[in-house]
Amino acid sequence: MGSSTTEPDVGTTSNIETTTTLQNKNVNEVDQNKKSEQSNPSFKEVVLKDIGLGEATDLENVSDDVFNNYLAIRLERERKEIELLKESNLEKLSVIIKNCIECNSFTDETMKRLINLVDNNYNNSVHFSPKSKRRKLESTSPPMSSSSVPNKETNNIQQSNSYQLRNNYDEEQENQKSQTQGSKSLLSRPNIYSFPPKQTQPASQQHVQLAAIVQRQSTLTTPLSSTYGSNSNNSMNTQLPLSDKSLRSNVQEKIVQQGSMSQRDIINGSNMSSQYSSQVYPPGYYQTRYGQQMVVVYPDSDSPQINQTSTIQHQQQLPHTYPPHYHQQQQLHQNQLVPQQHQQLQQQSISKHQLFGQKNPMSPQSHYLPNNESQNLGVINHRRSFSSGTYPVVNSRSKSPDRSMPLTVQKQMNFLIHTPKHPPPT
């Protein structure tokens, strides 16, 4: 008995292999199609994602008719929203135009400017906020600090060498000194104590010279009619020396030539410039700040030695400009004058001051001073400002004692300390 073995059929095996290969190919194709579908989504998927539905899982179950109807409804709703927005904008625009028409300040130029702003393309990127907010502007420049950034004003200063600045300063100081010295020389009056000492003369010659001075001043200050018309004055003229007669004749001729000056101007010395006074009077005369006349007299015509004196009227009007012993000497000379001449001089001064309503300076009871000077003296003569022996200088502008002009020979000094109990004069 032998065993029987079944051998597989060659045809059947080949068929099985072909079927398996075909199945594998189909599976691969299906997978590739799925991948292609996933990589290339359909238009439906794209629209649904754009609307905001997200990734739809049941897209295959949605039919095309339903999808198309949904899209139509969505588009219609958006169109209505746009129409409503247009209508509201038109209403607002009509209200704005109406207000602009009613407003007088709104002109065509402003309308054109608004249209230009709307038409410009570069303004489309600008978005205005609905509510105005206060924002801090950022500065483009770096922060200014004293350590890092220098000061602009210090950079604008012109730089120069030190020696140039010193030279310019010295020149300015010299110019100022020259100007002040020139002004002081013009304003300062001559000092009666700056001349060399006078040679001593006999008492009789001094009395004669003083009488000549008094008569000469009386002829210059009294009216022309009373001076040159009376016989007494003519008799007095014959008693003077020859030099005084010639001087008086020259003065009389110049006064007659310059007849425009009034009688009061001749007496008071007002409205008289330096040029005019030098033409009318001889070179010995000059005008004081009080309006009176002073004379510089030479004792002899041959030897002109400087002997500066003043009239009795000017002496009594300005008692503070002379030392005490000077008044005593002049009072002694007045007492020793001829009684007839002294009486005639006193009558002339009384009549002259009665004519102009002034006090008689010849009287020993009163000393005539201007109003402003008397007030100043009243303020200065305070019991704690000056002692009884001092002679204050009226209207002394310089506070330094070195710069003040020495008007008196003896200058007393008082050292006063003002306290709350004794305050300074006001």
Curated annotation (Swiss-Prot):
Please give the chief subcellular localization of this protein.
nucleus
Report which superkingdom the organism of origin falls in.
Eukaryota
Family note: Belongs to the POG1 family.
Q: What are the start and end residues of every segment in region (Disordered)?
A: 1-41, 123-158, 170-208
Q: What is this protein called?
A: Transcriptional activator POG1
- Where are the compositionally biased (Polar residues) regions? 1-30, 176-188, 197-208
Q: Which organism is it from?
A: Vanderwaltozyma polyspora (strain ATCC 22028 / DSM 70294 / BCRC 21397 / CBS 2163 / NBRC 10782 / NRRL Y-8283 / UCD 57-17)
Q: Spell out the GO cellular component terms annotated for this protein, sorted alphabetically and separated by semicolons.
A: nucleus
Gene from which the chain derives: POG1
Task: List the keywords (alphabetical).
Answer: Activator, Cell cycle, Cell division, Mitosis, Nucleus, Stress response, Transcription, Transcription regulation
**BP term (GO), one:** cell division
Start-end of Low complexity biased regions: 139-150
| Function description | Transcriptional activator which promotes cell cycle recovery, after pheromone induced G1 arrest. May also be involved in stress-resistance.
Subcellular location(s): the record lists:
Nucleus
